[in-house]
Amino acid sequence: MLRVSRTKLGRLSPSLSRGLHHKAVMALRREDVNAWERRAPLAPRHVKGITNLGYKVLIQPSNRRAIHDKEYVKAGGILQEDISEACLILGVKRPPEEKLMPKKTYAFFSHTIKAQEANMGLLDEILKQEIRLIDYEKMVDHRGIRVVAFGQWAGVAGIINILHGMGLRLLALGHHTPFMHIGMAHNYRNSGQAVQAVRDAGYEISLGLMPKSIGPLTFVFTGTGNVSKGAQEIFNELPCEYVEPHELKEVSQNGDLRKVYGTVLSRHHHLVRKTDGVYDPVEYDKYPERYISRFNTDIAPYTTCLINGIYWEQNTPRLLTRQDAQSLLAPGKSPVAGVEGCPALPHKLVAICDISADTGGSIEFMTECTTIERPFCMYDADQHIIHDSVEGSGILMCSIDNLPAQLPIESTEYFGDMLYPYVEEMILSDATQPLESQNFSPVVRDAVIASNGMLSNKYKYIQKLRENREHAQSLSMGTKKKVLVLGSGYVSEPVLEYLLRDDSIEITVGSDMKNQIEQLGKKYNINPVSLHVGKQEEKLSSLVATQDLVISLLPYVLHPLVAKACIASKVNMITASYITPALKELEKSVEDAGITVIGELGLDPGLDHMLAMETIDKAKEVGATIESYVSYCGGLPAPECSDNPLRYKFSWSPVGVLMNIMQPATYLLNGKVVNAVGGVSFLDSVTPMDYFPGLNLEGYPNRDSTKYAEIYGIPSAHTLLRGTLRYKGYAKALSGFVKLGLINRDAFPALQPDANPLTWKELLCDLVGISSSSKCDVLKEAVFKKLGGDTTQLEALEWLGLLGDEQVPQAESLVDALSKHLAVKLSYGPGEKDMIVMRDSFGIRHPSGHLENKTIDLVVYGDVNGFSAMAKTVGLPTAMAAKMLLDGEIQAKGLMGPFSKEIYGPILERIKAEGIMYTTQSTIKL
């Protein structure tokens, strides 16, 4: 059984008893804060001691209280609903504000001493009703040590819970352990039953029944107070050995599997001065900001389970930050080799029991408490999300804020033993009289938070804390995060919509498209600014200087100009486009400025990178290698909207799409570098796709794929290809344009503004070398011959009106004129939708020799009268990365793409909430 000291009950302070007041009445109110609160501040034997002194004790009826009402009645208590007769009302947790009675003395845990915002309404009501509030938390002795607390039982319940949770988590990771037979603390009638279950588990451990592949288990206890001691009482029932913190590394790797290892951590074990690595306790108490914690590097990497019982104070180092968690969850080389049925742990740190329940405190990523009914959650540091399942990636977390309620009878008796010596002086409290007139001991007097309608002198600081917080809140409301979005095209809307969900973000949109920014200004709460980035560099610089972040949705050729302005003003930057050589040249300047510039955050490039890196990183975690990677992606009209010769439609300028087929491409195929020539040989590189057969797709290679062996970290790949998807027939139709010379960026004087207008018929006559006055039949015959006798290509030209009398748009070049024409002919009509299709294929060679063929499919449709599929899949990942930068989720500095888990992890999770879903499928070849 637990070694819990009990106070011998007898008469209370004689001096107080001699002053017995015949009207002094005490009441135990029932707890109503939540369904699990079954404790009371006093047990029946304490009530008996009080009634024996002649005091009247009222007991408010409660079927929820763990100790039955009749036990209190036997002890002399009077069971009744109305407790208004009492001058002292005792409880454990706060009462509802509407149930407070004026000019009474109340004692409970108020959680007001830090000006906790959630309880300031309660404090205001206490002041209004001139209630005297005694807070158990502030009942301390002359050394400042609490004399009334449930801490030991929080430690007891907490470690029982986390042992149960570890059993579940280890099972999810593929391991049955003796911890499976330990239940939650409240499943036991008393701690003795729980201790027996722990002993049984310990017996199995001592027999060597722990899985070998998980290695020795280590438990780290922070703090030396009652919480830590209570947890250690239970831990000691296991076959345990305590070691010094510096010995953890050795035992975590080479320890005896027939025992578990524990270490008790004090400040001097992990806190060091930043300048010289020394710990000075006196200096630390005065200047904690001069110190850092080495817990993340010296202790945590060798910890299986952390039992945290310390609170975090401002300016003190945290035990673990989110970045620490990312590092700790990175797969390391296990000292024990695992096999498929007996895997090694993905990382050493399996679980954290944060008994302090201090949200956002010493464990930074513990941002919300768990509950007795839902005791566990998993923190996935890569994606920075918390989920309820014990499966998947992450650290198991247990952070229940009312742990002693799980062992309510023993907690009540333990707490009552400590409170009992002070009860009589509290009974004699008369809240109608000045506090100074009361004959209180220092322990009780110093715990009075409020009396006679005002805060006690010792706690007047609470009002100052409230004022400071309110001032800070008003400042934060007035200080918004400023974002400059450059560009007002179709991608900008989902970016604006996503970011403006956060009221603390203020967006300025800069564009030279007056109509577009005016429309955006009507729809969204933005500051529209007329700006031509290429021609107004000074205006761009002044705008950038006032921002926290710049998002460039401009053509890629303008990104270096924007980046230079960001570097000069040390402002972070985001873009969806490729990191071009011109942008890459600024890498050193970006690093020197200490800013973050992230590119390739859209769809392709963007989501394709993220899906690839997630798969590659997971393969590496299990020791597999990537033998092949093929990725095709395309933005297309929905099938029902593809009824034109190109099987394609444009939602933005077609120039980039048209010029793409003129560019050469390089890829790796079965170990050989293949150079695909663009232009007239473009069709030679087009391949029919055998997936999604109902879509009848074709694809062709895009840009230089070979460089991704280094970017993705897959030098083992013998095949690397990234390409573009289109409906079958697209390539052939565009090949006709190439044959005629229409896809040409050279200046064409006949289309300049000062030239005479031309019709398409006249232009085509010129291109095929016949008189502009030739009849249509003659032109068709000449064009047909130029096309090599391809009827399909000729019909495409006719359908598009390129052999008729429609005027050619004025333009700098032939391709610009064709682009303007197609933008009108092949634009999306009302109610028409687009779609994007992506297929990533991987060949993954596992250590066993098996080859896994894995595919990832992403298919997204546009919304009728809403965002297009392309706008969503480009804009939303870009906006998410922007929000992550603003919120401090991305800490890395420099020029980068979305290749790290810090970036791609959260985005791949968050796009699902926006309806962007991808599916995976794998087959294994022996």
Swiss-Prot record:
Family, as annotated: In the N-terminal section; belongs to the AlaDH/PNT family.
Major location category of this protein: mitochondrion
Residues the record lists as binding L-saccharopine: 577-578, 604, 703, 724-726
GO molecular function, a single term: saccharopine dehydrogenase activity
Residues with the N6-acetyllysine modification: 48, 56, 93, 128, 138, 286, 458, 523, 535, 584, 707, 739, 761, 780
Source superkingdom: Eukaryota
Alphabetized UniProt keyword annotations: Acetylation, Mitochondrion, Multifunctional enzyme, NAD, NADP, Oxidoreductase, Transit peptide
Catalyses which reaction(s): L-saccharopine + NADP(+) + H2O = L-lysine + 2-oxoglutarate + NADPH + H(+); L-saccharopine + NAD(+) + H2O = (S)-2-amino-6-oxohexanoate + L-glutamate + NADH + H(+)
Transit peptide endpoints, chain numbering: 1-27
Location of region: Saccharopine dehydrogenase: 477-926
Any GO BP: lysine biosynthetic process via aminoadipic acid
Intracellular or extracellular location(s): Mitochondrion
Sites bearing N6-succinyllysine, chain numbering: 93, 138, 274, 286, 333, 458, 523, 535, 584, 732, 761
Residues where NAD(+) binds: 488, 512, 516, 554, 576-577, 603-605
Domain notes: The N-terminal and the C-terminal domains contain respectively the lysine ketoglutarate reductase and saccharopine dehydrogenase activity.
Function comment: Bifunctional enzyme that catalyzes the first two steps in lysine degradation.
Pathway involvement of the protein, from the record: Amino-acid degradation; L-lysine degradation via saccharopine pathway; glutaryl-CoA from L-lysine: step 1/6; Amino-acid degradation; L-lysine degradation via saccharopine pathway; glutaryl-CoA from L-lysine: step 2/6
CDD domains in alphabetical order: LKR_SDH_like (cd12189)
EC number(s) stated in the UniProt entry for this protein: 1.5.1.8, 1.5.1.9
Protein name (Swiss-Prot/TrEMBL): Alpha-aminoadipic semialdehyde synthase, mitochondrial
Gene assigned in the entry: AASS
Residue segments, region Lysine-ketoglutarate reductase: 28-455
Summary of subunit composition and partner proteins: Homotetramer.
GO cellular component, one term: mitochondrion
